[in-house]
């Protein structure tokens, strides 16, 4: 099953470069403690790496078992 990433904004990007603010915005994060779920792709991982001091990330499995 494809993996997903749960991304939570834990620190405000105010005071950081416009580049980092833009990355947070492109991840879909607008407010503190907001959580978004994204596909685990290299592009998303790169964005997270750029703002790793502002976010918390958790890997989750998508879907359940069909018994």
From Swiss-Prot:
Pfam families: Ribosomal_L30. CDD domains: Ribosomal_L30. Keywords: Ribonucleoprotein, Ribosomal protein. GO terms for molecular function: structural constituent of ribosome. GO terms for cellular component: cytosolic large ribosomal subunit. PROSITE patterns: RIBOSOMAL_L30 (PS00634). One of its GO terms (biological process) is translation. Belongs to the universal ribosomal protein uL30 family. NCBIfam families: rpmD_bact. Part of the 50S ribosomal subunit. This is Large ribosomal subunit protein uL30.
């Amino acid at each position: 099953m494809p993996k997903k990433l749960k991304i939570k904004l834990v620190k405000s990007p105010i005071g950081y470069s416009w580049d980092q603010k833009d990355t947070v915005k492109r991840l879909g994060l607008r407010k503190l403690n907001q959580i978004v779920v994204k596909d685990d792709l290299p592009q998303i991982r790169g964005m997270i790496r750029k703002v790793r001091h502002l976010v918390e990330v958790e890997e989750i499995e998508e879907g359940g078992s069909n018994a």
